[in-house]
Amino acid sequence: CCRSNNLLIIAAAAGVDSVKPGDIHTVKLDRLMSNDGTTHLTVDMYNNKLKNPHIADTSKLVFIVDHNVPSDSPKTAASQKKMRDFAKEHNIDFWEGKGVCHQVMIENYVRPGELIFGADSHTCSYGALGAFGTGVGCTDFLYGMVTGTSWVLVPESVKFNLTGKLPEGVYARDLILTIIGEIGANGCNYQAM
């Protein structure tokens, strides 16, 4: 399910019939999310590094303040203000103090079949809703923001066969933490589980 779903999503976003692991494709992005951890860096690059800057489609952007709420220093407050002002100036959906960015995304934006870039490593959690989400850095986020596209390396898939029933008091979180403990924090980098 996971592997075929990711392949179908990437193929559709790339406008091709099929893709295979290891391929690199230019894709159209359905949504881009950034939080207060790095948005100020993207805004600085947009304002200071681009000639004739523009945003491809502001309706695809979501900015969420969730990492430092309330702000813990004047520097953080200034970064969040920069983010807030940029969102207002460009009519970008802006959320502040409404929850963790990924929960806001899951409850309000993520739809099955979408390809989503987020400036956060937990963006891959959107796979739980049948979307392809991946975390990117500021430069890739900015490129996606101004072009509406980016590149994607089609990930390999890792299949985990789980059998049996979880004992009482053991939950999905315990299961994934056990798997991560066994494979290591980097055990499935750029792979779909």
Regions found by a protein language model. Name each.
Residues C1-M193:
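Fe-S-dependent hydro-lyases/dehydratases of central metabolism
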